[in-house]
Amino acid sequence: GRTAQVNGLMSVTIQIPGNPSKFAATKTGPYEENEEIIVKVPTTDETPLDLTRLICMVNVEHNCYVTPAVGGEMDFTNPYPITVVDALGNKHHNTIRVVPTPPKTKYAKLWEKNAALLNMSSNTTGLAFYQNYLAIQEYNAPIKLYDRNSGEFVKEIPAASTFMMRARTDDAGHLITNRENVYGAGFMVYYYSEETQEHINLLNWTADAGCPDDLGYNMSVKGDVTKGVAYIYGMCPHNMEIYYWKLEDGQLVTPDAKPNVLRYGPAGGDWTSAPMIQRATLEDDSKHYIAYNRYSGATGDDAAYKAKFSMFTPAYEITSLNQDNHEYRILGFNVFNIENETYLALNDQQADTWSGGVSTLSVYDITDPSKMELGPDDAGYDKFCLFRGEWSPYATSYNSWGDLTTAIVPTDTGYDIYIATCVIGGDTSQTTIRMYKMTWYRQ
C-alpha cells in the first residue's frame, strides 16, 4: 500500500510584493512540532523591509492542507502561526518568522579631500590607521593625524628621520614608518613609542653596507614588532627581489645588512615601481600576496606590462587576479580577514600617454581563491566583486605612487572596515585621499 503523507509542511517561501525574487526558509521540512521556521529577507537602510506586506507560499505533502489557508499579502510583524493537517487528519503546528537581513556588506564614502585641503604637499606617500586616526606620512615631512570619520586635522607627530616614505601599523597597532634609501640615506624602519613619544629604530641597512637604491619605496610588517615573532618587508623598484627580516621580542634575528631575499621570477622581468607585499600569517609556510607594476611611462595599452595581483605559496604556486578586474596600474592593496572570510581591497589607476588617469577602489571576496580568476562577464561575478567605487579626479603619476590601508572595528552586528586610499598626482589638487566604510553584517 501507499505510505500516508504525515509530514505535512515541507517548505516556506516569502516574496516582497512587486519583487520577483523569492526567499526560502533557512531549512526545508519536514519540521518538528512547534518548530520555528525562519526566513531571512533582505533589507537596506534605503529600502527597509515592510513586514506588514509580504507574500507567503508554502509547499505541503500530497493530501495535506493548511488551515486557515495562506495567500495574498500577510503581516509578519510577529511570528505567524501555521497549522497543517496531514493525510490522516493529524494537526502539525509551526510558526514562521521573517527576519529582515541586511546585505552581507554595504559601502559608503565618508569623505574625500585633496592634499591642498589637508594642508599637505602632493606627496602623501604613506597611509596607516593609528588608534582612531588616519595617519599620513608626507614624504620627507612630519606625520599628520586626521579624524578618520571626518578628515579633520587633529595633530602632528615629528618624522623619525629624513626621507620618510611609508606609514603602516603592526598587528598590535604600533605606528611603523620607514626611510627610503635615497642619496645614501639607507633603509631604516621605526616604531613610535606612545610612552616616550619617540621613534625607536628597529632596522638600519646603510647604503655603505650594500643597501639597494630606493629600498623602502614600499614596506610592510606582520606581527607585533615589540614582542613575539614579527617580520618587516622592504621593496625597491627595478629588480625582482623581496627583502625581509625576522624579529623576536623587538630585536632583529636577521642582521640589518643580510636580509632574507625572495626572488619573484614569476614577474617575468623587473618591476618599475616597488611592489606591495603582504605576508598572510606568522607561520613559516605562510603564503604571500603581491602586486607589482611593470608600466614604464608609455601609454598603458601593452597587456604584457599591465599590473598584476597574485597570491603565492613558498613553492611559488601562484593564483592571480584576473587582470580584467583592475586598471593598468595598482597603487595599493590590503588583504584582510573577517571571521572565516577573506577580502581584498584594491586601489588601481589608469595610465595614459601623460602617465595620468583616474583611480578607484574595489573590494573582492577571495575566501575561495579560485574565484580570483573570474572576470566581469563570468557567472557568479557579483558574489566575487562586491564593490567598485566612483572615479577619483584625474592625476598625473609618473612614479605610480599611491596607497591603501584598512582598519577593522567590531560592532554589535558585525564589523566596520575603514578603507583609506590615496592617488598621488602632480600637484596638491590632484593628490586625493578618500575614506570609505565597508560594513560587514553577521548573517
Give the role of each language-model region.
Residues 105-117, 145, 149-162, 190-211, ...:
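Beta-propeller fold detector
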Residues 113-141:
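Beta-strand-rich domains and repeat architectures in extracellular enzymes and scaffolds
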Residues 117-128, 158-174, 178-180, 187, ...:
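Repeated scaffold domains used in trafficking and secretory/extracellular systems
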Residues 131-135, 172-177, 226-233, 284-291, ...:
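Entry beta-strands of beta-propeller and related beta-repeat scaffolds
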Residues 140-147, 182-193, 229-251, 273-274, ...:
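Structural motif
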Residues 325-393, 404:
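Loop/turn-rich, solvent-exposed surfaces of beta-rich toroidal or solenoidal domains
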Residues 393-443:
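Blade-level signature of beta-propeller repeat domains, shared across WD40, Kelch, NHL, RCC1
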